[in-house]
């Protein structure tokens, strides 16, 4: 298998750090190398809502993640690799969303083997060098390299990407400033970038202040510059060709009571965010021919002016039980910046749960979501969350963003499929029940600098399950239910 130069260089740097383990061991007294072993079983039925044969996932997988970390003075370095093998294309990594375009305009043209996810692959998740000498504060670090960008709500950043990122985290002030661009997936199966990531640059920053004990308020901004080439009208397209580009700016306000901290024992917790989107976007249509070829249509330019909000309240009934409600709304012209996962500790437990359903896995794009939940946590040994979601379209004649639902229709007599459009004028997307239960075994001993790199600080067994019932925005012929259940077992050495 031939690797592209960027992937080969990244893996070379990462494996060089792995081989340097004995040297790195002398640089710090903390545990600085190890391996995370993750076994996953997934059962998923009717992702396509019964619109074609197949669409089910039933498999088990093994995910090995060796890592190495070292520090000397103000300098540090880190790398994490990954080897995955499975009986089906299951979701061993929650960062990898099973999203499809809900607009009905995204067509699978079947010509992009470079983007086909395989059952087994090797990857390099992170490799970065850090410097912490700009200020005397221990929570300050500049990282350069492929790294995990993540914010508390997961709605702006939660991904591994090549970046230069400066973080400042103290008792009263948190700040971030950085730039990022994806150059490679660093995976043996995905040898080309997704079209949305090609030639797309990101600039971002945020600052929040603890204005009174336990209460934070802040601002954040993100700018995306995409100058990728769009094909001219009449040119043939494949799945690796971009169909949109443009320049977009997100500006947001946020306030919370440290609600994403599962150790927070405040009787009443809240969070709230309000974001504005502004910019321009060029898009080309896609037309198909009888011989299964696809061609670029007319290019259209439009202004993007949208907004989104996410609000939540959580009441602590006693040291173990909490109940709460959350509401999210994104206008028809709003989209997220593409670096999000929408996973966070919003139910008040250690488990990072998808804000828009473990089965539906929606995005903030012309979607309104109301959620009710109850959560339980016993010491640091167990936690559980039971969640109800109701999903609606804000504009009944406009598509939605990506989701874990992939209802399709066959294109005539060809062997290709495209997304099934939603019913015009109908807003009810459906409802869902989620259950997430976790048993923790032991606390991990990891360097503080790696808090963003690991989703879980300890060994565990976790069930993530969701049952989705589609609403009348989907066609009458679709199945009544779709479910997704994932069991993860994680251990560290």
Swiss-Prot record:
InterPro entries named in the record: Alginate_export_dom, Alginate_Permeability_Chnl
Domain of life of the organism encoding this protein: Bacteria
Localization: Cell outer membrane
One matching Pfam family: Alginate_exp
Any single GO CC term annotated in Swiss-Prot or TrEMBL for this entry: cell outer membrane
Residues of the signal peptide: 1-25
Polar residues bias locations: 93-111
A Gene Ontology biological process term: alginic acid biosynthetic process
Membrane topology category: Peripheral membrane protein
Region annotated Disordered, chain positions: 93-115
KW Electron transport (keyword) present: no
Pathways per UniProt: Glycan biosynthesis; alginate biosynthesis
Keyword terms of this UniProt record: Alginate biosynthesis, Cell outer membrane, Membrane, Signal
Function: Has non-porin-like, channel-forming properties and probably functions as an alginate permeability pore.
Family the entry assigns: Belongs to the AlgE family.
Protein name per UniProt: Alginate production protein AlgE
Organism of this sequence: Pseudomonas syringae pv. tomato (strain ATCC BAA-871 / DC3000)
């Amino acid at each position: 298998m031939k690797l592209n130069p960027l992937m080969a260089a990244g893996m070379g740097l990462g494996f060089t750090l792995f081989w340097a383990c004995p040297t790195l061991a002398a640089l710090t007294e903390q545990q600085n190398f190890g391996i995370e072993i993750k076994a996953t079983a997934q059962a998923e039925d009717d992702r396509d809502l019964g619109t074609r044969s197949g669409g089910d996932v039933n498999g088990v997988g093994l995910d090995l993640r060796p890592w190495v970390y070292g520090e000397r003075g103000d300098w540090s370095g880190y790398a994490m690799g990954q080897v995955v093998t499975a009986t089906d294309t299951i979701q061993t990594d929650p960062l990898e969303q099973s999203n499809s375009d809900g607009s009905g305009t995204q067509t699978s043209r079947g010509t992009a083997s470079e983007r086909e996810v395989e059952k087994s692959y090797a990857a390099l998740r992170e490799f970065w060098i850090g410097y912490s000498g700009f200020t005397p504060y221990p929570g300050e670090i500049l990282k350069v390299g492929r790294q995990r960008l993540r914010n508390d709500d997961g709605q702006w950043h939660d991904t591994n990407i090549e970046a230069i990122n400066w973080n400042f985290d103290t008792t009263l002030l948190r700040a971030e400033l950085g730039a990022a661009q994806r150059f490679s997936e660093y995976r043996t199966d995905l040898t080309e970038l997704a079209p949305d990531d090609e030639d797309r640059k990101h600039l971002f920053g945020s600052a929040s202040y603890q204005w009174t004990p336990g209460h934070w308020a802040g601002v954040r901004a993100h700018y995306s510059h995409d100058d990728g080439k769009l094909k001219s009208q009449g040119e043939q397209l494949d799945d690796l060709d971009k169909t949109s580009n443009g320049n977009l700016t997100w500006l947001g306000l946020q306030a919370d009571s440290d609600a994403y901290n599962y150790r927070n024992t405040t009787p009443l917790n809240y969070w709230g965010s309000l974001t504005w989107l502004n910019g321009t976007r060029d898009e080309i249509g896609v037309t198909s021919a009888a011989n299964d070829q696809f061609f670029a249509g007319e290019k259209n330019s439009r202004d993007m002016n949208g907004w989104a909000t996410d609000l939540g309240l959580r009441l602590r009934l006693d040291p173990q039980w909490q109940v709460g409600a959350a509401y999210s709304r994104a206008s028809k012209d709003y989209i997220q910046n593409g670096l999000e996962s929408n996973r966070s500790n919003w139910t008040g437990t250690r488990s990072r749960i998808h804000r828009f359903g473990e089965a539906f896995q929606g995005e903030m794009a012309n979607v309104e979501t109301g959620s009710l939940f109850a959560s339980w946590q016993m010491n640091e040994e167990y936690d559980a969350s039971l969640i109800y979601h109701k999903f609606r379209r804000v504009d009944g004649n406009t598509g939605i963003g990506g989701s874990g639902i992939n209802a399709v229709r066959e294109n005539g007599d060809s062997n290709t499929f495209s997304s099934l459009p939603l019913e015009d004028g109908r807003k009810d997307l459906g409802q869902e029940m989620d259950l997430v239960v976790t048993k923790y075994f032991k606390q991990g001993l990891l360097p503080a600098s790696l808090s963003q790199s690991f989703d879980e600080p300890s060994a565990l067994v976790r069930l993530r399950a969701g049952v989705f019932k589609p609403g009348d925005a989907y066609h009458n012929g679709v199945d009544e239910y779709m479910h997704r259940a994932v069991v993860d077992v994680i251990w560290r050495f």
